[in-house]
Each structure stands twice: as C-alpha cells, then as structure tokens.
C-alpha cells in the first residue's frame, strides 16, 4: 500500500503534443474503419494530393455500410464446431430470423466487459443469443447453440477481416494497415480488445481513434471550415459520445469528452419491442409474456420490425408494425406515431443530456460558444433527438455530414496523416477517464486527470505507509471516484527488494505513460535501492498473445478454402431466401394464381430447387455441386413467378370489369 509523498511533485509533459512524422518508405494504403455497433464502414484516401479525397469503399453487395453481424451455420460442420461456416454483414442479417441463437449482433456492447457488469446482465435478458462467462478471466463471451465459445474480439475480427478483404478487392492490392475507431468513452480494456480484434483480422492497427474525433476530422478537413469550436454529438447503435473540439488552422484539439458506452439504438429497439409485446398480449390475453420472450425466433422478428418502425418514424408521422403469424396463428398489426415513439424513449434521450453538460463544463465553455454541432450515428436522424440537441446548444445542428459515413472517413484521414499522405494536420486527442493508483486506506490518488491530451507522460513521488516495507503493490485504477472500490482496476504492479526504511522515507517514483492509442504504460522505481519495475496495462480482452498468434496462424492456413466456401455458402443462402419468399407467396395467394397454366410447372420447379438446396446443405464440402447453376435457376424461377402474379392480377382485374 502506498502513501502519497509530501516531497517533490514532478509534472512531466502533461500536455505533450504529438506532430506525426512522415515515413517516406511507408507507401501502403492505410484504411480507416468505423467498427460500429449496428453498421460498419471502411474508407481510404483516394488522392494523396487532395486531403479532402477520403472515400467510402463499397462492399461486395454495392453497399456503403455493412451490418455488424456475424452468423455461424451450426449444420455446416456437425462433427467439428471449429470448422463451421460463417456469414458476415447482410448475408448474416438475412438469415437472422431463422438462426437467431447463432447470429451475433451488437457485440460491440460486450467487448472488453466483465460478465458480471450490470449492462451485460441487462443485455442477456433481451439478446436471442447466449452470453456466457469465461472462467479464466471473468469476461463476457458468446456461445453458439452447439457450444463454440468466442470472445467479442473474435467476433469483431471476423467482421474486420471481411472489411479488409472488401478493401483489398476494391484497391487491387494487399491491405494490412488500419486506423480503427472506438467510442470516446471506451475504457482501456475495451480499446485493447478492439486492437486484439484488428490483430486477429491480420491488420496492423496503427491507431485507435475516438469516433467523435474522427467525425470532426472529416468535417474540419475542409479549409472553409477549419476554425472554431465544434461539438460532436454521437448516438449510434450501442454507445453515446459527446466531444468538444477546437479546430484552428489544421490543428484539431479535443477539449473534453464524455458519454455512455451502453446507450444507443439497441436500447431504443428494446423499448419498442416491449411496447409491441404489451400491446399484443393485451389483445391476446391467453398468451403470456413469457411465452413470447422465450421464443427466440419470435423475439428476433419483433426486433427486426421494431428497428424498421424506428427508421420509418424518422421520415413519417405514423407507421404500422405488421407481422403475420407472429406467434402461433396470431397476426400482429400495431400502429405507432412519431409522438408515441418520442414519449416512450424520452428517458433514453434524456440520458444524453448530463454528459453534454459535463463536457461543456470540462471544456470551460458555454453552449453559445459552440460554432457548429455535428450529429453522428444513425439515431441522430430521429427528429426528437435533433430537437433536443437544438435546445441544448441553442442552434440547429449542421446537416451537411452523413452520420453513417463520417466516422470512417475521419479514420481514413487519420490514416493519411500517419502514412504521410496528408500533411499539415495535427490531432490532439484526450484520455476520457482519470488514471491513478491506490494509496493508504483505499483512496484513489489521480495522476492523469480525464481530458488530458495524449500522448502524455507524468511522474509523481509516493512513499511507504508501514515501517520496514521491503515491497509495495501498486494497483492502477481508472475512474472518477475518490475511493478505488468505486473505480475499475486495470493493472497491478509489484515492486520488491526496496531498502527497508521507516514509513514515509523511501521515495518511489511512479510514472504513467499513455500513448496515442490511449494504451497505458506504468513504471515504478525506488531511489535508494535502484529497484524498478514496469508494465504495459493491457486489461484482459480475453485472448493471450499465444492465443492470438494461434488463431492468426489457423486463419492464414485456411484462407483460400474459407473464402471459396464462404462465397458458395452466400450464393446458396441468397437462393434459399428467394425460394422461401416464393413459396410463402404461392401459399398466401394460391386461390389467385392456381388457375394459371404455368402454376403447376413452377410449383414442380420450386420443389426441384428446394431439393437441390437441401442436397447442397447435406454435402457442403462436395465442391462438385454447381452452386452457380442453382443460383441462376433460382433467379430465372423468380422471374417466372413474377410474370405469373402479373398475369393472374391482370385476369382478376378483367373479370371484375
């Protein structure tokens, strides 16, 4: 246990500013990745002579964002769960309703978190997939229905690998350098877990950058608006951040940041889901809430329509939430207005207000001092949120920024700064939480206050609290509370072999050194004995260096085969969905179309294609099966079915005349 010394207080470089040097040998592209809770995006600098040329890279489906969803097909490898096929992005989202317990979304809310965290326990009640406790480190992990255990970092790495491959296909060259964004209020454990995910994906993560800072880079890189105080209000799928930045002639300095790492669109969706369930069981009293909530497929379908309703009400005043056969033979049709949505989610919206006020206070400015308010994250499209932001700052937010893309663009700009493609731009970010150590009586002794510019290095002198101590245990904490029991323990450093002296006499120099990623190094040295010790505070993200190396080696050994199987599986998945949609339509409108002469032929062809898909699923490793042929036949069948419906509709109209 340490006792804070009354002797010399050393303050070293507390506001160190880093001007990134260029490396003429570094010519590879550095991609910028927004690893979002709901959607992710990747960007690059298109023209090294144009700092405004940051460009989003479209994925293989031509979309500018990719759903942050990873699914496992447990049927693909019954004998070896480690060889299961994976689906990523939209391919995973399409099959979510029929494979909900093996489809992992919003896992960013779990990354770097302990299983016992109250936020994790709250998520367990609403997530259709299984969240389990890792016995070795107490972290929240994920489990498929057949028992494959994955850390959130491993799930994120699958998504990052997909974005890496997307970039390589687009750029026509190998990519291994990246800047990845994280919520500004992510702690050290969550940041390290994100870096681990990048490493697993085969990426050298040059920098982890805060999402609001990236958005400000994207906004302020334009010479016409490169001066002033900027507030970035970032409400995404799972996290909320507010950052205050001062932009002046290419220098981006973060003045303050605050937020909530467990507040976002997922919480809004859950409120709507609960409203729908309440309405449904009120209209169907014979059905209990427990029956609904325990049905994974039903809950996933409810979540999907809740998300769609939320999006609709950002553009229209009223919508209808409709689901046929939502439970057993019951159908769902619930009207919802924009005002109703506002009222039921107001408590969530109001949770963003205290962090905004605290950030303004920490930056020592008033709302009227802000020149521009930038909105980031899909949730900021909600009119009520825009209204609250306008009231908070006394001005309408800037609407020139795409809230889904600006973070990835900013990450690409930061990548351009690091590679030397972009010059004369300086980024000064901050540490979001206070860092310190435990001293006598369990007190928290801060060394680096929150909102200190990073990188930063600071040393302070401490002493012993007991006579004759030959060693000290230095516990490193992160948080804002006066007692360590209310803060987060992130590291433990033991210094032994010091000269036994009366308490208060030994001089123990404790140094905190935070790099530009926000990763912390701590060292301690005792003056008289010369003993010293140091650690890099890498909170347990769930994976050791050996485990990470092994996973990377396994991934490299199987990359070509994995890619081919993934492509075949995605083609079949699309064909399967098309066939299912056609089958459902034929059943629903059988009376209308059964008299058409093509009807029986198409029904037989549907059966044949269904059997072909079934054969493929039973023999997925048989590379002789013509997957492309199945997909082409499905496309042709869908076209014939459409013509059949058009003909039947026309005949019905003629009969009614």
Swiss-Prot record:
Family statement drawn from the similarity comment of this UniProt entry: Belongs to the heat shock protein 70 family.
E.C. designation(s): 3.6.4.10
Disruption phenotype: Disrupts iron-sulfur (Fe-S) cluster assembly. Normal cytosolic tRNA thiolation.
Assembly behavior: Interacts with the Fe/S cluster assembly proteins ISU1, MGE1, GRX5 and JAC1.
Record has Nucleotide-binding as a keyword: yes
Key words of the record: ATP-binding, Chaperone, Hydrolase, Mitochondrion, Nucleotide-binding, Stress response, Transit peptide
Extra information: Present with 5550 molecules/cell in log phase SD medium.
Taxonomic path: Eukaryota, Fungi, Dikarya, Ascomycota, Saccharomycotina
Broadest EC class assigned to this enzyme: hydrolase
GO cellular component: cytoplasm; mitochondrial matrix; mitochondrion
Any one GO BP annotation for this protein: chaperone cofactor-dependent protein refolding
Species the sequence originates in: Saccharomyces cerevisiae (strain ATCC 204508 / S288c)
Localization of this protein: Mitochondrion matrix
InterPro entries (alphabetical): ATPase_NBD, Heat_shock_70_CS, HSP70_C_sf, HSP70_peptide-bd_sf, Hsp_70_fam
Full protein name: Iron-sulfur cluster biogenesis chaperone, mitochondrial
A molecular-function term among this protein's GO annotations: ATP hydrolysis activity
């Amino acid at each position: 246990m340490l006792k804070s010394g009354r002797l010399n207080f050393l303050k070293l470089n507390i506001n160190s500013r880093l001007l990134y040097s260029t490396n003429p040998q570094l010519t590879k592209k550095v991609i910028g990745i927004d690893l979002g809770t709901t959607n992710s995006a990747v960007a690059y600098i298109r023209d090294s002579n144009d700092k405004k040329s940051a460009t989003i890279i479209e994925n293989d489906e031509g979309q500018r964002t990719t759903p942050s969803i990873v699914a496992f097909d447990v049927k693909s490898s019954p004998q070896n769960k480690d060889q299961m096929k994976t689906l990523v992005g939209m391919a995973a989202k399409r099959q979510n309703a029929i494979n909900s317990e093996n489809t992992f979304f919003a896992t960013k809310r779990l990354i770097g978190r302990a299983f016992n965290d109250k936020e994790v326990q709250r998520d367990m009640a609403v997530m259709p997939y299984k969240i389990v406790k890792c016995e070795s480190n107490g972290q929240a992990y994920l489990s498929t229905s057949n028992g494959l255990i994955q850390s959130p970092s491993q799930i994120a790495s699958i998504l990052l690998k997909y974005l890496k491959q997307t970039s390589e296909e687009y750029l026509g060259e190998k990519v291994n350098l990246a800047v990845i964004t994280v919520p500004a209020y992510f702690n050290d454990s969550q940041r390290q877990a994100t870096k681990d995910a990048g490493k697993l994906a085969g990426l050298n993560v040059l920098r982890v950058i805060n999402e609001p800072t990236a958005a400000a880079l994207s906004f302020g890189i334009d010479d016409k608006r490169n001066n002033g105080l900027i507030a970035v209000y970032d409400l995404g799928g799972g996290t909320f951040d507010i950052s205050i930045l001062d932009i002046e002639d290419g220098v981006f300095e973060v003045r303050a940041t605050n937020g909530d790492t467990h507040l976002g669109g997922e919480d809004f969706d859950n409120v709507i889901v609960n409203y729908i369930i309440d309405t449904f069981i009120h209209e169907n009293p014979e059905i209990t809430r427990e029956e609904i909530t325990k049905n994974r497929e039903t809950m996933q379908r409810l979540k999907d329509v809740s998300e769609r309703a939320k999006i609709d009400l950002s553009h229209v005043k009223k919508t209808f939430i409709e689901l046929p056969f939502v439970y057993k033979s019951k159908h769902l049709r619930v009207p919802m207005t924009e005002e109703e949505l506002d009222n039921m989610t107001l408590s969530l919206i109001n949770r963003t207000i205290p962090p905004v006020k605290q950030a303004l206070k920490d930056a020592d400015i008033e709302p009227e001092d802000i020149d521009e308010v930038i909105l980031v994250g899909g949730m900021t499209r909600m009119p009520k949120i825009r209204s609250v932001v306008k009231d908070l700052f006394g001005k309408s937010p800037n609407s020139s920024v795409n809230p889904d893309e600006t973070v990835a663009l900013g990450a690409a700009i930061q990548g351009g700064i690091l590679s030397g493609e972009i010059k004369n731009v300086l980024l000064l970010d901050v540490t979001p939480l206070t860092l310190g150590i435990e001293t006598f009586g369990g007190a928290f002794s801060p060394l680096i206050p929150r909102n200190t510019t990073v990188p930063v290095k600071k040393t302070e002198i401490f002493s012993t609290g007991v006579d004759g101590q030959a060693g000290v245990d230095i516990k490193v904490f992160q948080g804002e509370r006066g007692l360590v029991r209310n803060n987060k323990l992130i590291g433990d450093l033991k210094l032994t072999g010091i000269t036994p002296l009366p308490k208060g006499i030994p001089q123990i120099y404790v140094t905190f050194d935070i790099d530009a990623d926000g990763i912390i190094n701590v060292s301690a040295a005792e003056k008289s004995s010369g003993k010293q010790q140091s650690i890099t505070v890498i909170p347990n993200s769930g994976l050791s260096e050996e485990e990470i190396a092994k996973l990377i080696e396994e991934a490299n050994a199987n990359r070509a085969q994995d890619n081919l199987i993934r492509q075949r599986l995605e083609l079949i998945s699309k064909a399967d969905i098309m066939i299912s949609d056609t089958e459902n339509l034929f059943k629903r409108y059988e009376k209308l179309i059964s008299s058409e002469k093509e009807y029986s032929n198409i029904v037989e062809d549907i059966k044949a294609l269904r059997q072909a898909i079934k054969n493929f699923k039973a023999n997925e490793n048989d590379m002789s099966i013509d997957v492309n042929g199945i997909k082409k036949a499905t496309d042709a069948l869908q076209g014939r079915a459409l013509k059949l419906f058009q003909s039947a509709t026309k005949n019905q109209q003629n009969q009614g005349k």
